[in-house]
Amino acid sequence: MINTFIKKFPESSSCLKTLKECSFDIDNNVFLTNSPHPAYNYDDIKTKYASNIPCKNDCLSSVDSLLEIDGKLLWIEFKNKNITKSETISIKRKASESLLIFIDVTKFDLKQVHDNSEFILVFNKNKNPALLKREQNKKIVDYQGFNTITDNLAKLSGDHYIHFGLDSLELAHFKRVYTLSSSEFENFCHSHHIATQ
């Protein structure tokens, strides 16, 4: 699917970077992954796309990166900050508008893109104290192994918990949605044969 996008929007071919570069937080001078795996910097693609429409760059938002693994599009947003409700709204907007750009360029229908797309939010666990507190409480309240049992059942069923209210993206936009800490993302990369260092 990415090849179709590049063919129809050749300016985007210059936006190929690494996941590490796409994860860079300029405000804090930090990377959320060290992966050298090639990925398209979708923010750069969005800027090139927006230069062709009247509203220019400020009317669109986008996720940080896009890559294709085993025929699946992986849309990735990196967040090195506390994810508030307003930040969640911003993330949903970025995801939606990223898909709109892709669909406009490729002319694929939404169902086709949905069925071949996964969204990943990679976040800094240390900057999300409510999530850390919930995990600490989970360990304290683990009534006779209840949390361990439910976690194992979720793993067996292929389910996963989606943080920050982003589960609605899985219903409408993407086949799967993941919210992963930086270390969980490294594990995800290993299990999906994405280079990590």
Language-model segment annotations:
Residues 81-135:
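Catalytic cores of nucleic-acid endonucleases
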Residues 11, 137-197:
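Polybasic (Lys/Arg-rich)
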Residues 23, 30, 37, 69, ...:
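Short, flexible loop/turn elements at secondary-structure junctions
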